[in-house]
Amino acid sequence: MPGPAETQAATLAKFIEGWKTFTPEAWTETWTDDCTQNFLPFTMGVPPRTKPEVLKLLPSLLGVLHNYKLEIYSVLHDASKGKAAIYATSFADTPFGDFKWTNEYAVFLTFSEDGTQVSKLEEMVDTAFYKEFFPKFQKYMIEKGAPANH
């Protein structure tokens, strides 16, 4: 049985605040230790990531995003199922000329049994954006001598 609605709502608010802050620690603060992040659609071929994997990879990505901003359009919370959905777009400047980070998402959260943490994160991303962004990001990281995983 899912945790209390008020507890889940507080966790959801804290998750969104961490996403807006968008440091590795702030963004994953509400995640359980065994939380998985899944990129959707599956056709992107990105395997699920554990919290430690996300914490390792995120600094490379954040290093190229400047003036980051998150705009939330809709939040749906189904406390009886212990789930929430967030529709949002994030914006940032990048070092790739005039190319801007403009990533549209639908994020689906599953809460821990007690509702105090997020145990699963599924991120439906803008595939057209990623097809354009990741080659630029990978090239940039290779030029900097760093690994560029997505």
UniProtKB/Swiss-Prot annotation:
Its EC number is 1.-.-.-. It comes from the Eukaryota. One of its GO terms (molecular function) is monooxygenase activity. The keyword Oxidoreductase applies. InterPro entries: Fungal_Meroterpenoid_Isomerase, NTF2-like_dom_sf. The keyword Oxidoreductase applies. Belongs to the avfA family. Monooxygenase; part of the gene cluster that mediates the biosynthesis of the dimeric xanthones cryptosporioptides. The pathway begins with the synthesis of atrochrysone thioester by the polyketide synthase dmx-nrPKS. The atrochrysone carboxyl ACP thioesterase dmxR1 then breaks the thioester bond and releases the atrochrysone carboxylic acid from dmx-nrPKS. Atrochrysone carboxylic acid is decarboxylated by the decarboxylase dmxR15, and oxidized by the anthrone oxygenase dmxR16 to yield emodin. Emodin is then reduced to emodin hydroquinone by the oxidoreductase dmxR7. This is Monooxygenase dmxR10.
